[in-house]
């Protein structure tokens, strides 16, 4: 596939550092846009023209109105003619009817031509009338002088002759080109249809079989295939023709490259326009160009199969290469850039922490190659040669995606997100107060029980892009702890308790620590680990607690060692934690599997809580939904998966399925866990 670049996204040429983002206008990016040609599926599209100005649109609309009036007058005259007695009698004769074939569907993109849809030609009288109309509309003296000058030009004989030539060329250029055959094996298809219809006993099927067996139809299909083979077969480019054509490029170093390209394999190269030249700007992994190793970035394309390329824009290159296959002969001027031999790149696997849609990104070099993904998707990055735009495949799409797609590089994405945040902060109006002083935020902070060491403010301001991942299969004797996260009243505590009650030999809870005194019938090490306040505070300072807090002047907390004890016993540790504890837990060596329990819709949540005898207010339900969005936005990068709890029994079965899958399938985990 040959595609095109938009070069406005960088201003520096160094590969060793992040390149600056050029926030140019869409029109500027349109000038540098690269075109994707020979793309799989519907990716390749022609570059859209820049919109006309409003004044030109108004003039065009006036011309359309005049043309429409003439058509209406013509139709009126036609109706007058149709009212004659002879035509009325002819109209009473029943028309010939055929058999309606509901299975027939015109090929997408084929337009049935009709004189009614012919290109409208602007006549000199229309132009003169439009100028007269504009002359009456515009009142300033400068415009009147301009219109008078144009009217004199329109009345000039030389201009009118040139205008007629223009119209004649327009009519010729808009003539439909002869259709290109879609296939050259119509006979084989007819035989296949007959095979399919053999067991069919319907009347229509038998009629179709008989029709396909008639000598006339078989002769027609044979003739079709012969003509199609001639049309679809590219004329071989001989060495003599190539050497003869490159003689015109005397004085320039020229190389000849031949690439075999199958019909179902895209070429996999991107091109851009530099003045009159067509330059290869990117080699895409997975295409015929990359596999051949013969095309390189910076090469100028002079000819393809004997057709001169210099002077063509990327749209014309798109049209030229869209149907080419077989042997492609390129005449190139090699790139003058001296690049070190490419090092063998290793594939890295990353988890995306943001959503990306290339159709909304004005800086993507080639929109047709942009790879869309959602937060949480796994991407297999196979090339980071361009630090700004990586080439990657999305997990699960490798077989259906012949070419690697373009995704923003990590540093590039961080840079433009930082720029976006700066712009948004600058736009925020300052809160005004008395005497031009800013008001203080008097909203009280609600106390929560969580580990406050290693302040989470950095997490909130960190720009999340990608996280490198590796596959990990948990050992049979060392199960990963299961962490349930979710807003209140969403069922995570109920799900945890049900697992504990139904499979006591498989699941266990970490024994918490406390500074309060032991009560009657409580067993140390089973109900709590009873420690002194001094020892508890020392463990807090040492970062040994996943989460902790104070209640009635006593400290409570869950330690990393308590979770590790459950893991070492061979059981699965079940925890229900607050989101503030996830950073400490994830930075430990416990390798947690974090499941987000999300609420259903507001109405469904109300019904579920009503079954439990709860009657929440509408604002309480809205608060739960809003809290869910907040948790997903701020902590979603920690979650391994999510369960929507619309039914507690179904949610329990899904939770059990996910836990069981950890024993049978490897899971993606941060690569730092395995180093």
Swiss-Prot record:
Q: Name one GO cellular component term.
A: lateral loop
The family database entries (PROSITE patterns) matched by this protein are listed as: GUANYLATE_KINASE_1, GUANYLATE_KINASE_2, L27, PDZ, SH3
Q: PANTHER family, alphabetically?
A: MEMBRANE-ASSOCIATED GUANYLATE KINASE MAGUK
Residues modified as Phosphoserine are: 14, 25, 83-84
- Annotated gene: PALS1
State the source organism's domain of life.
Eukaryota
What the entry lists under Gene3D superfamilies is as follows: 2.30.42.10, L27 domain, P-loop containing nucleotide triphosphate hydrolases, SH3 Domains
| Annotated keywords | ATP-binding, Cell junction, Cell membrane, Cell projection, Golgi apparatus, Host-virus interaction, Membrane, Nucleotide-binding, Phosphoprotein, Repeat, SH3 domain, Tight junction
Q: Where is the composition biased (Basic and acidic residues)?
A: 10-34, 54-78
Q: Residues annotated as region Required for the correct localization of PALS1 and PATJ at cell-cell contacts and the normal formation of tight junctions and adherens junctions?
A: 1-345
User: What do we know about how this protein assembles, alone or with others?
Assistant: Heterodimer with MPP1. Forms a heterotrimeric complex composed of PALS1, LIN7B and PATJ; the N-terminal L27 domain of PALS1 interacts with the L27 domain of PATJ and the C-terminal L27 domain of PALS1 interacts with the L27 domain of LIN7B. Component of a complex composed of PALS1, CRB1 and MPP4. Component of a complex whose core is composed of ARHGAP17, AMOT, PALS1, PATJ and PARD3/PAR3. Component of a complex composed of PALS1, CRB1 and EPB41L5. Within the complex, interacts (via HOOK domain) with EPB41L5 (via FERM domain), and interacts with CRB1 (via intracellular domain).
A GO molecular function term, named singly, is: protein domain specific binding
Please name the GO terms of the biological process aspect recorded for this protein, alphabetically: central nervous system neuron development; cerebral cortex development; establishment or maintenance of epithelial cell apical/basal polarity; establishment or maintenance of polarity of embryonic epithelium; gene expression; generation of neurons; morphogenesis of an epithelial sheet; myelin assembly
Residues recorded as binding ATP, renumbered to this chain, are 486-493
Q: Where is the signal peptide?
A: none
Task: Pinpoint the Guanylate kinase-like domain residues.
Answer: 479-660
Q: Where is this region: Interaction with LIN7C?
A: 181-243
Give the main location.
Answer: Golgi
What protein am I looking at? Protein PALS1
Give start and end of each SH3 domain. Answer: 345-417
Taxon lineage: Eukaryota, Metazoa, Chordata, Craniata, Vertebrata
Belongs to which family?
Belongs to the MAGUK family.
